[in-house]
Each structure stands twice: as C-alpha cells, then as structure tokens.
Amino acid sequence: MAKKRGKKYQDALKKVDSKKEYAVDDAVDLVKEIDFANFDATVEVAFNLNVDTKQADQQLRGAIVLPNGTGKDQTVIVFAKGENAKAAQEAGADFVGDQDLVEKIQDGWLDFDVAIATPDMMPQVGRLGRVLGPKGLMPNPKTGTVTMDVAKAVSDAKAGQVTYRTDRDGNVAVPFGKVSFDTAKLVENLKTIEDVVVKARPAAVRGTYIKHASIASTFGPSVTLDLTTF
C-alpha cells in the first residue's frame, strides 16, 4: 500500500496543476513557493529520456559544473601519490592519501561526498568497488574523477560539480541548488543541466528524446516543465 502523504504535502499539491506544463521560470518559482521543509531543501530535476539503456551507447553518464554551485559544501578525497598528492592538497582536497586512504575506507570510513583518483591508483581503489560503487562514489573517467589533473577535478568538485547517469528506465535525476537560491540562479543551473543532457543525446535515438521533465524540492510535489521554454 502506498504511503499516505501528510497534510503539508497535500496542501502544497493543491497549488500544482497536474495537467499543466510550466515554463521553466514559473516552475522554479512554484517549487520555491510550495516547499514546506524546515531546512534549506535541495531542488532536483528529473528527465525521462527515450533511450534504450540495454545498449551501451545509450547509457548516459557524466559530470556538470553548475554555474551557481549546489549550495552544498562537498567533502572531497583524492587517491594520489607524490606530486599529484601535493597538487590535490594545494587545490583544497579535504583528504589525500594512497594505500592508507584505501585501508581507512576498508575499515568503514565513508564521510565524504566525492572521490577522485589518479589512474595509477585505480588497481588499489578498485578493491573498494563493493563499498563505493553502490553509493555512487567510485572514481570514474566519465565523470572526470579518474584523472591526472587532480587539481582541476578537486576545483570542479568544490565549485559545485554534479554527476548524472541514466537508470535502467532512462531516467536522469540531478540536484541543481537549494530552495534559498534566487530563481535566476536556479534557472541558470537548470538550463546548464538541460543543455548537457541534450548534447549527450545518443546518435541512435530516433524521435522525441526528452519525453518528460519535472522539478521538485526534497519533500515537495513535482512540477512538470514545458520543454519549449528552455
């Protein structure tokens, strides 16, 4: 049985026309208006794409640096040695190490948001796949987190980089800021994400690519977007 939503959610839902597709600016304004969380809630966009995720070339994955950040301070760790470790520290990484950092995570430590590694560290980091993989923390070249340019990777992560990937049903969900952000900043972040998703369209896709898009705050109801207003 589906869980019944509370009164605050129901009151918020009454303000949303479920049959309407809202212009991007209006949708952001509405999500901000109907948010009822007692904290600065995250705002997320969800796209449903016309892709066949059984085909490797139609599985989208990547990273986006949002122009206005996410509103969240990211704890960043880097697996690196020597000069690369020094570069990571100078770029502002919170924790830098090699085998010692691997062992720390094997012992159960997971107090971080982004993990970055140099390619030479991946044989050791690969042992953490069962721990980091399910949490979306495993370094990956597609998201720019397996790289020799650790300084840039750290800077991007600290600046508000978000990652995206399709689930098996072709959905992509990406956070793009906080309810407290100005509408203009949320809209700019949202349009940046939409632009990246559109450019990542697989060549094999025919017909409509983005079938549906909506935004919502952490606990709030979703608001459907008019895709022609991006």
UniProtKB/Swiss-Prot annotation:
The reply on keyword Repressor is yes
Q: Which cysteines are joined by disulfide bonds?
A: none
One Pfam family, please name it.
Ribosomal_L1
Q: Which GO terms describe its cellular component?
A: large ribosomal subunit
Q: Name one GO molecular function term.
A: rRNA binding
Highest rank taxon of the organism: Bacteria
SUPFAM superfamilies registered for this protein in UniProt: Ribosomal protein L1
User: What are the record keywords, sorted?
Assistant: Repressor, Ribonucleoprotein, Ribosomal protein, RNA-binding, rRNA-binding, Translation regulation, tRNA-binding
Q: Which GO terms describe its biological process?
A: regulation of translation; translation
Report the Gene3D superfamilies cross-referenced here.
Answer: 3.30.190.20, 3.40.50.790
Subunit architecture: Part of the 50S ribosomal subunit.
Known role: Binds directly to 23S rRNA. The L1 stalk is quite mobile in the ribosome, and is involved in E site tRNA release.
The UniProt family comment states: Belongs to the universal ribosomal protein uL1 family.
Q: Report the protein name in the record.
A: Large ribosomal subunit protein uL1
